[in-house]
Amino acid sequence: MTLPKFVITMDGVFRLGMVNQHKDLLKPGDQCIGGGYYHFDFISNRIILDRSSYDFGKPKWHLWETLKVPSTYRGLRIIYKYDDGFHDDFNVSDELAIEYYD
């Protein structure tokens, strides 16, 4: 069953899509160091990220200064919700430099 999932590679490349497994979003040679699930909040122009990848765990935001995002998502803010009762939401768009790619 395909679900809306995302991954982030060691190089800071952000990929998302409807896939069976998070690894289906990786290209040969990619090293994934975090992933989870996503949904679009069109009212507030945001991509909401949450949960974690069973295989790769939660994104390790402290490892990146720049996140490389597909240019299709230009103009959308990116937020990661921990939903664990301990952490505040992580505003990816404010905390990391966003670089767009085609």
Annotate the PLM regions:
Residues 1-102:
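Eukaryotic phosphoinositide-binding membrane-targeting regions
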